Amino acid sequence: MNNFINIRDISVKDLKKILFDAKKRKAKRKKLNYLEPDKDIPLKGRFLIQMFEKSSTRTRLSFYLAIRQLGGGALNLRKDELHFGEGGESIHDTAKILSNYGDIFMLRTDSDKKLLELLRLIMVSQDLLQKM
């Protein structure tokens, strides 16, 4: 799976696998500190770029801890740090720059149009897609 935009786009089989894997992973974490990475560190060396047009403490922290627990790193970008077609930098340019530095992307926005445009423009590393 290379994106998770709408739950209706995921097959029942894939959704069951996601939930089963999450339950199994959560059970293995019982003895670990919440900042300690999972033993298999599946996202070691991977980088999540979180983009927030709408602030959310709970979303930001849950994604940050999840990526840490899976062995990766994260960067948070606030609305004032993003240039989606504003200030002389096009959304295409922004997506290209983000693609150079990130492996995984998360956008919290009110705009389905902006989300779908970013999805179309952002390039995700093919070796990461093959592992998932």
Regions found by a protein language model. Name each.
Residues 1-61, 65:
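Positively charged, low-complexity intrinsically disordered leader regions
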Residues 3, 73, 125-128:
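Conserved beta-strand segments of alpha/beta enzyme cores
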Residues 6-9, 82-85, 106:
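Short N-terminal micro-motifs specific to bacterial/archaeal maturation
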Residues 8, 78, 129:
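Residues at the C-termini of beta-strands that transition into short coil/loop
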Residues 32, 86, 92-98, 102-132:
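Anion-binding alpha/beta catalytic cores of soluble intermediary-metabolism enzymes, centered on
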Residues 40-41, 70, 89-90, 120-121:
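Charge-rich, low-complexity amphipathic helices
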Residues 47-101:
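Active-site cofactor/substrate anionic-group-binding motifs, chiefly glycine-
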